[in-house]
Design a protein with these regions (language model features):
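Sec/Tat signal peptide C-region and signal peptidase I cleavage site
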Residues: 19-25
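Positively charged n-region of N-terminal signal peptides that target proteins for export
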Residues: 1-6
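Bacterial N-terminal signal peptides
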Residues: 7-18
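Active-site helix-to-loop segments that bind/position phosphate- or nucleotide-bearing substrates
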Residues: 29
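Subset of outer-membrane beta-barrel
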Residues: 34-38, 125-133, 139-152, 162
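Solvent-exposed loop/turn segments connecting transmembrane beta-strands
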Residues: 33-42, 66-73, 108-113, 144-152
Length: 163
């Protein structure tokens, strides 16, 4: 009888892993800083869907140009994949992300570059109340073509609504 219960355990565990998990979606509105080459405000929105550990997100962000510092304006349109903790740990859900998309960079109505780019980063989502969360995110971009700054970085804080 004992051998039978041990042989049923792997089968039952496999069924648990193969059972469908509910998908979740979320939207994040954020403000942050792009310090490359000088600190400027970045604002944007991300919309995502998650399946327990894996998620996908489309994100739009805009950084204003600073003509006095010769810091270009930057628009990014990125599609990202996320790997995240399946459940919050002490009210926090950690994630890593990587993605690709299109960017547009301008400065002083003289310089303009549109091309593709990639990004990697990570962050944390903190549970507040119900579906409302705070999100903190850090990204490093690699911009192709001839941008003025090919490796901009970004840190943001945002309000995230899970539905």
């Amino acid at each position: 009888m004992r051998a039978l219960s041990f042989s049923l355990f792997p089968f039952a565990f496999s069924l648990l892993l193969l059972s469908p998990a509910p998908a979740t979606a979320d939207i994040t509105a954020f403000l942050g800083s792009n310090p490359t080459p000088s600190a400027r405000l970045v604002k944007g929105v991300g919309v995502g869907v998650g399946l327990v550990i894996v998620g996908f997100e489309f994100e739009y962000a805009h950084t204003n140009e600073d003509r006095e510092e010769s810091a270009p304006g930057l628009w990014t349109y990125m599609f990202n994949g996320l790997v995240q903790t399946p459940v919050p740990i002490a009210g926090m859900q950690f994630y890593g992300t990587a993605g690709a998309g299109v960017f547009h960079e301008t400065l002083n109505d003289v310089f303009s570059e549109t091309n593709v780019g990639i990004n990697v980063g990570g962050g944390i989502k903190l549970n507040l109340a119900g579906p409302l969360r705070l999100r903190f995110d850090y990204r490093v971009f690699t911009l192709q073509g001839s941008p003025l700054y090919s490796k901009p970085q970004r840190f943001y804080a945002g309000v995230n609504l899970r539905f």
